[in-house]
Regions:
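Extracytoplasmic beta-strand/coil segments of soluble accessory domains associated
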Residues: 59, 66, 74, 91, ...
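Short acidic/polar hinge/loop motifs at secondary-structure boundaries
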Residues: 135-165, 184
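Short strand-turn segments of transmembrane beta-barrel domains in outer membranes
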Residues: 165-170, 179-212, 229-234, 522
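Transmembrane beta-barrel wall of Gram-negative outer-membrane proteins
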Residues: 198-228, 233-273, 299-320, 370, ...
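Face-selective signature of the C-terminal outer-membrane beta-barrel domain
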Residues: 251-264, 301-451, 529, 533-539, ...
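Membrane-embedded beta-barrel scaffold of Gram-negative outer-membrane proteins
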Residues: 311-313, 320-338, 474, 480-486, ...
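Gram-negative outer-membrane beta-barrel transporters
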Residues: 367-371, 443, 536-545, 559-639, ...
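C-terminal beta-signal and adjacent terminal beta-strands/loops
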Residues: 489, 540, 634, 657-717
Length: 717
């Protein structure tokens, strides 16, 4: 019997009779046919009681079936999928999202490099992430706008990941133009566990978690993680990471509350991207130089993150109420050197710089959804919500040498307030026709106090109204069609919004807008027309009024030219048997600047093709495993497309053996084919000691790790 899971979204719970009626026509499974009797009863005036509503929960695999989405590119990844693959880094959980790529261009303690829909998202510029309702992206961040550090995630505790693509959702605000991922932790465990893993290059990881019931329906989870890793680098990474979690909850997801406390600390050495000319020459300053060597071995960072967050939800016959809140403290000191010695007159000590920040964030959201009494045609949900966020930030930039401060460049205190108000109307006009209309209003207040250049101090306010519209048709023959249109935005760094002078050259500059608009459309379908196969297809378009791009010479994101992207995505989930699961995804993108410029129309680092293939074997007596293959296509590195990155293929393998009901052994083989890939490549000017003062335009790359393994043992108590 297939272990099938269908989780009903709480916002759609009152429309369960309609969902089941539609599914009844498209699926012959006995469970769904029985559930359709509930539809018949409701249509004749018999209503579900509150207790019955709370108890409806169908366990299974995922929530991508017909009737569960507002677009073809939306889905939910279940915990069963999340534990099946080998992961090099925690953030690679996001690679379950079709078309998403997660890499790293420096030390493994910093936020990853993300790519989706032909956008180099840098560390999160246009992809919003959240954990248990708490946003992870950081605006006006010292290292990059929208910085999204997921290294504090404990993958074993993740219950599900809900993902959306495009600016079509009224609940999604800043940084969500390309998409968003909403990660949910478990609030209870089936059984406590302890896991120990070891691998090459000094890799060691230990994680333990316990679940306790305190009184009636009160649940406590405690978890602790410790990880050490040196990586393949000649200058050992020395990553030391400590992670702790407390979770207290009561009730169910639909009627209950949960509170989370998280603490995370990490420090590491970084091997930043290196110039390809050094690899050709094979030596630097009389010493041999190879792929995993560092030009400046003093690069590195340390970070801390502490958070308190909570969620509460109440569902009854007439409405759904939701409240979430969060308080976050974080800090970061990161030392980088991407250009080495470009100005030996002004900076004889080299180009290393420090980006630092300390941040306190307070925020929350509340919403109410009104449910119609009519359970048939013209049934509706009306939702009104409010989101608030206040950031208090001290951040800056210093020129450094060997991590010693040589010159202060920027030192600012920023207060940034975000207020978002959204409204949404969802209506079933006919049994096969549904519309979702939304409107979002955002206001950002920026207040900057510049300690080193007072002229750059100031206040500013930006507002943006973003309409949304979705049309859902079907299902017919187990196939559903979608049309989505929406406007979105990303915020820009507050320091750029109030800037009047360049802090280095003292020349006058023009401030950037506080909010930059985006607009997207999508046409797609989802189908289950073939037995045991779920498929989706999306054709999409996304325009930005200003492209955020990564500047390799400064290590920052900057506002640039307007852009236009269009593409196609396909995803398939096939379970030919109870033991075998196959997932395949393909994404193609055409990305161009939208205005005329002699430099060219190509957008640097806009990956044109991404493909993933995964095979998982499970539900056998004692063995299980998975094989994952990821393809990343080439990308233009400069605007005229004269220099391109190389495509890459990475293959990961996981083999697991159940020794007894309490003990599992897992072997992960990462990059099993030992391919020489690059995690990232840039093309820009840099200068090594002894080179001409003008420097050299060159390809700079950060290699992927070669074949490595990790052996783990998990004991359940």
């Amino acid at each position: 019997m297939m272990n099938f899971k269908f989780i009903i979204h709480p916002n759609k719970m009152f429309l369960l009779p309609i969902r089941l009626a539609l599914i009844k026509r498209s699926c012959a499974l006995g469970l769904w046919c029985c559930a359709s009797l509930v539809h018949a009863q409701n249509m004749t005036g018999i209503r579900l009681t509150q207790a019955q509503i709370q108890d409806i929960e169908i366990f299974g695999h995922d929530d991508n079936s017909i009737g569960s989405s507002e677009s073809a590119s939306k889905g939910v990844i279940s915990s069963e999928m999340l534990v099946s693959r080998a992961l090099l880094r925690p953030a690679e959980l996001l690679e379950y999202i079709p078309g998403m790529v997660v890499t790293q261009h420096s030390g493994d303690g910093k936020a990853n490099q993300y790519f989706l829909r032909g956008i180099n998202l840098d560390h999160g510029t246009d992809f919003a992430t959240s954990l248990n309702g708490m946003p992870i992206n950081m605006p006006t961040h010292a290292h990059g706008q929208g910085y999204s550090d997921l290294n504090f995630l404990i993958p074993e505790l993740v219950q599900q990941v809900e993902y959306k693509k495009g600016p079509y959702y009224a609940q999604s605000g800043d940084f969500s133009s390309a998409g968003s991922a909403h990660i949910a932790y478990r609030t209870r465990l089936k059984e406590p566990f302890a896991e120990l893993s070891v691998g090459l290059h000094g890799y060691q990881r230990a994680v333990a978690a316990n679940s306790t019931t305190l009184g009636e329906d009160l649940h406590l989870i405690t978890a602790l993680e410790r990880m050490n890793n040196n990586g393949p680098w000649s200058n050992p990474e020395g990553l030391r990471k400590t992670n702790a979690l407390l979770a207290l909850s009561q009730g169910s997801k639909n009627n209950g509350w949960s509170n989370f406390f998280s603490a995370y600390q990490a420090h590491w050495n970084s091997t930043d991207q290196i110039p390809s000319r050094l690899l050709t020459e094979g030596q630097y300053q009389g010493q041999a130089f190879g792929l995993f060597d560092a030009v400046d071995p003093s690069d590195g960072a340390q970070t801390n993150r502490y958070s308190l967050s909570g969620e509460w939800q109440n569902l009854n016959k007439t409405h759904i109420d939701k409240i979430n809140w969060y308080s976050i403290y974080s800090d970061l000191r990161i030392f980088s050197n991407f250009t080495y010695f470009t100005d030996p007159v002004k900076r004889p000590y080299g180009d290393q710089f420090e980006q630092f920040e300390r941040r306190n964030t307070l925020g929350g959201a509340l919403s109410r959804s009104w449910l119609s009494d009519d359970r048939g045609t013209y049934a509706y949900i009306n939702t009104l919500g409010l989101q608030l966020r206040q950031d208090f930030i001290r951040l800056g930039l210093n020129n450094t040498a060997q991590r010693k401060v040589m010159q202060n460049v920027r030192d600012d205190q920023v207060k940034q307030l975000q207020i978002g108000l959204f409204a949404e109307n969802e209506v079933y006009w006919l049994e096969w026709l549904k519309t979702i209309a939304g409107l979002r209003l955002d206001q950002f207040d920026f207040q900057v106090n510049s300690f080193l250049l007072s002229q750059n101090s100031g206040v500013a306010r930006s507002m943006k109204m973003s309409p949304k519209l979705s049309l859902i048709l079907g299902p017919w023959h187990k196939t559903e069609f979608f049309f989505n249109h929406g406007q979105g935005f990303h915020s820009n760094d507050a320091r750029g919004v109030t800037a009047k002078f360049d802090p280095v050259t003292q020349q006058a500059v023009s401030p950037v807008p506080g909010l930059t608009s985006s607009m997207g459309q999508e046409l797609g379908l989802k189908t289950q027309a073939f037995k045991n196969l779920q498929s989706s297809l999306a054709i999409w378009r996304l325009n930005f009024a200003s492209e955020l791009f990564y500047n390799g010479e400064t290590g920052t994101t900057q506002a640039g030219r307007p852009s236009e992207r269009k593409g196609l995505e396909m995803a398939h989930h096939w379970t030919p048997s109870d033991q075998l699961q196959i997932d395949a995804a393909l994404a193609w993108t055409r990305a161009r600047y939208a205005n005329n410029d002699p430099a060219g129309h190509f957008i640097p680092n806009a990956v044109d093709k991404v493909a993933n293939l995964s095979l998982a074997v499970r539900n056998t007596r004692s063995w299980s495993g998975s094989l994952g293959v990821r393809y990343i296509g080439a990308a233009a590195l400069i605007e005229n497309n004269a220099v391109r990155s190389a495509p890459s293929v990475t293959t990961n393998l996981r083999i697991a053996k159940k020794i007894n009901p309490q003990t599992d052994i897992t072997l992960d083989l990462l990059n099993v084919l030992n391919r020489h890939n690059n995690d990232i490549a840039y093309f820009y000017n840099s200068r090594l000691n002894g080179e001409a003062l003008s420097g050299v335009e060159d390809l700079h790359l950060h290699p992927s790790e070669l074949r490595t393994f990790r052996l783990g043992t998990k004991i359940k108590f």
